[in-house]
């Protein structure tokens, strides 16, 4: 069990998640397979990331203070603290722009795993959009439990 709000997407880089490898951390952020790396093909500007390369990550105070039990997050690594909430910054941006056209840039995907599929359930209106998801082969797999729609993701 892993709450979906703890699944962070890092924008500005591209990467794949190799689910055939064991998880490095458990749900509490404790290293259980320290030599494992599920994140593969990590790139910035179309080039592999140098392990010594530095990046600045904008986040909220919950995550920066260790919320979500993400490893290697420490207060001494924070370089700027703003009084604004993420929500307020986004609202101001939308007001300033007047109109925005948000779209997912498909910067991450699952790494291919031969002869493997994953079954998941979601709202039935997902059937209207499954074909629009870039880089993913998603098939309708019928009806799920309690009014949900069932889908098959081909890895």
Regions found by a protein language model. Give the residues of each.
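Catalytic centers of hydrolytic enzymes
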Residues: 1-155
């Amino acid at each position: 069990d892993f709450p979906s709000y703890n699944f962070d997407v890092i924008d500005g880089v591209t990467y794949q998640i190799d689910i055939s490898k064991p998880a490095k951390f458990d749900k509490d952020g404790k290293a259980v397979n320290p030599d494992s790396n599920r994140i593969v093909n990590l790139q910035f500007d179309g080039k592999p990331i140098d392990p010594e390369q530095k990046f600045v990550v904008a986040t909220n105070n919950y995550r920066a203070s260790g919320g979500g039990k993400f490893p290697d997050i420490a207060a001494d690594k924070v370089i700027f603290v703003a009084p604004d909430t993420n929500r307020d910054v986004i609202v101001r941006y939308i007001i300033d722009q007047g109109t925005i056209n948000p779209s997912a840039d498909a910067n991450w995907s699952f790494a291919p795993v031969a002869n493997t599929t994953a079954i998941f359930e979601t709202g039935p209106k997902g059937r209207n959009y499954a074909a629009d998801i870039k880089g993913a082969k998603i098939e309708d797999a019928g009806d799920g439990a309690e009014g949900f729609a069932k889908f098959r993701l081909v890895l």
